[in-house]
């Protein structure tokens, strides 16, 4: 336990020292507030820009509060996930490549503690970022469009946090299994590309990890079959356990990549 606490503190200090605790949440805040503000002021922006043909008229769609939160989730699912993957894809492999891990591996060490420390800190940063992003989106949504059911919003937020734990578990596990460039390629294929594929042809199946965030937003509008939601949530939780186990095993197995 003492070793785990020391490793956890090390990872946390590294995230603070590299300002990940600051700039990643800031990115999510900017993504979160962009949709409510842009959609609300779009007509004014178009008028200010000018150069519109005479007689040109544009009817702006009327958004419901839930629509803006769903749009913000879409931003998090694209740009936000790429930022998180980029920030933590080298959490294990980069230490092996630059020799930093030598300071850890020269003494008896629990690879379980090592992996958990990296995954937990990455998940905490991801969850803080999502909460900050949704807070910004919620603030301007309520201010400009109307209220949102708080219980449904919290259910969606908790669901998205579990999804982020899955994403960060996969990211750190890929970093443990491969060298940085390969890990990045595999993770990007599995997460963002997987989401794209699920969006295009996902109507053929109802239960996949990539649908969890979508089902979470469906809680806002009561537009989700709860049976599919619970099965998907269960699949994601099981996969988290499996991926963490694989990550721990690969962390130990790939000591051979260590550069002294």
Cite the ranges covered by each PLM segment.
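Short hydrophobic, aromatic-rich alpha-helical segments embedded in or entering the lipid bilayer
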Residues: 203-223
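Aromatic- and glycine-rich beta-strand/loop motifs that create alpha-glucan
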Residues: 1-28, 256-257
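Secretory targeting signals
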Residues: 28-86, 90-91, 116-184, 218-237
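Junction motif at the cytosolic side of a transmembrane helix
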Residues: 238-260
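Helix-loop-helix units of permease transmembrane domains in multi-pass membrane transporters
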Residues: 91-123
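Central hydrophobic cores of alpha-helical transmembrane segments
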Residues: 24-29, 183-195, 211
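Residues that define the loop-to-transmembrane-helix transition and helix capping
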Residues: 22, 112, 181-182
């Amino acid at each position: 336990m003492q070793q785990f606490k020391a490793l956890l503190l090390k990872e946390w200090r590294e995230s603070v020292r590299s300002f990940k605790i600051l700039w990643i949440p800031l990115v999510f805040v900017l993504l979160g507030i962009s949709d409510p503000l842009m959609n609300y002021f779009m007509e004014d922006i178009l008028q200010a820009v000018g150069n519109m043909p005479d007689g040109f008229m544009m009817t702006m769609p009327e958004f419901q509060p839930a629509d803006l939160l769903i749009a913000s989730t879409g931003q998090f699912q694209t740009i936000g996930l790429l930022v998180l993957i980029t920030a933590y894809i080298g959490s294990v492999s980069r230490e092996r490549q630059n020799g930093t891990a030598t300071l850890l591996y020269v003494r008896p060490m629990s690879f379980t503690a090592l992996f958990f420390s990296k995954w937990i800190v990455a998940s905490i940063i991801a969850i803080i970022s999502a909460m900050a992003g949704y807070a910004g989106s919620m603030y301007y949504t309520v201010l400009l469009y109307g209220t949102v059911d708080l219980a449904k919003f919290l259910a969606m937020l908790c669901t998205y946090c579990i999804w982020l734990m899955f994403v960060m578990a996969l990211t750190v596990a890929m970093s443990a299994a491969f060298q940085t460039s390969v890990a990045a390629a595999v993770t990007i294929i599995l997460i963002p590309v997987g989401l794209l594929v699920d969006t295009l042809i996902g109507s053929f199946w109802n239960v996949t990890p990539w649908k969890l965030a979508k089902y979470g937003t469906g809680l806002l509008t009561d537009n989700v079959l709860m049976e599919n939601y619970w099965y998907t949530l269960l699949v994601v939780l099981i996969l988290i356990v499996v991926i963490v186990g694989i990550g721990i095993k690969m962390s130990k197995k790939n000591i051979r990549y260590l550069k002294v």
